[in-house]
């Protein structure tokens, strides 16, 4: 069905240059798996199926981190067979998250969250029992909690060309994360930053594995060891990757210049000052605890170096504007309701 739908669309638009871009893990796998069937009709950059499977599944990604000298949190796992008896190799709190994001997306149970934090054994037992009481039956990743607020996170977006070389890297420092159950781990505001040492290490990793296309990494700075620890790699753009385009580095340009125009891309590190937001600035002002980062956000706002994800002036009809205002007001409500709640509570 995937291939037929796309080839039918291509037939209806013959004579046009068609570019494919995956926006989910599942579509990246399908694109990689059906590359030969789609290449006659579409232009795209895509990793191999083997690379996707080895790096998208968290347990395999951590093995790749070990091989390439990249740090990650102390990690264990459990299965539906042993989750009641598993012993953690670290102290609570414990992060609990699925190893198979696609399977978890399709499961349902009360108070489901994208990621859980268990602060003691009782909470651990309740959370794992709830997850395995659903249709999700794959392993769970159990991970030590890295201390620090949301602003200790980093998000890295990269584009690797058809030549398997990295051509664009953009690093962001989240100021605040989403707080809703389904939004935990998604970013609500990102400050564009630069860290050459970190980028050099990640560039070497991507080129060593022969990656092609977009990649997105989440990591957190661990002040105890003075290093970044990787959480995951997504084989696509991230939900908040527009922060790169908003800072002046249009992600689509790198893709089109590569797969359509076949231009030499060189190597670019995005380093323009910019603040990207999906949350209202008032929410950031209230919940961002670091005074220096808040001052930086206020400065960028005053200088007009701010982009609002949901605000597009070219699409600002009266109906859209009313929706935008309602959405922002609702953001205050849902942040207050869910702030700090990563347990099995509603």
PLM regions and their residue ranges:
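Active-site nucleotide/adenylate-binding loops and adjacent lid/helix of ATP-dependent enzymes
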Residues: 54-140, 162-163, 197-200
């Amino acid at each position: 069905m995937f291939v037929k739908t796309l080839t039918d669309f291509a037939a209806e638009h013959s004579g046009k240059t068609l570019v494919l871009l995956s926006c989910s893990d599942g579509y990246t796998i399908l694109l990689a798996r059906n590359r030969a069937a789609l290449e006659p009709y579409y232009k795209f950059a895509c990793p191999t199926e083997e690379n996707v499977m080895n790096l998208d599944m968290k347990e395999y990604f951590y093995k790749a981190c070990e091989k390439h000298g990249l740090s990650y949190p102390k990690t264990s796992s459990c299965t539906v067979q042993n989750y009641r008896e598993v012993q953690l190799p670290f102290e609570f709190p414990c992060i609990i998250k699925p190893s198979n994001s696609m399977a978890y997306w399709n499961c349902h149970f009360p108070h489901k969250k994208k990621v859980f934090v268990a602060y003691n054994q009782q909470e651990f037992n309740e959370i794992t029992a709830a997850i395995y009481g659903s249709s999700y039956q794959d392993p769970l990743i159990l991970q030590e909690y890295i201390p620090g607020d949301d602003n200790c996170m980093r998000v890295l977006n990269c584009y690797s060309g058809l030549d398997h070389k990295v051509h664009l890297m953009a690093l962001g420092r989240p100021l605040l994360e989403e707080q809703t159950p389904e939004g935990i781990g998604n970013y609500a505001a990102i400050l564009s930053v630069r860290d050459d040492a970190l980028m050099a290490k990640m560039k070497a990793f991507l080129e060593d594995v022969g990656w092609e296309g977009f990649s997105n990494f989440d990591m957190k700075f661990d002040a105890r060891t003075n290093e970044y620890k990787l959480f995951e790699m997504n084989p696509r753009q991230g939900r908040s990757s527009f922060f790169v385009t908003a800072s002046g580095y249009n992600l689509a340009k790198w893709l089109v210049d590569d797969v359509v125009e076949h231009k030499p891309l060189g190597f670019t590190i995005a380093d323009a000052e910019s603040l990207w937001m999906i949350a209202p600035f008032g929410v950031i002002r209230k919940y961002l605890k670091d005074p220096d980062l808040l001052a930086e956000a206020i400065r960028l706002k005053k200088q007009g170096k701010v982009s609002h994800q949901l605000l597009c002036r070219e699409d600002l009809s009266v109906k859209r504007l009313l929706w935008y205002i309602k959405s922002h007001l609702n953001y205050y409500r849902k942040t207050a309701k869910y702030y700090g709640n990563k347990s099995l509570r509603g």
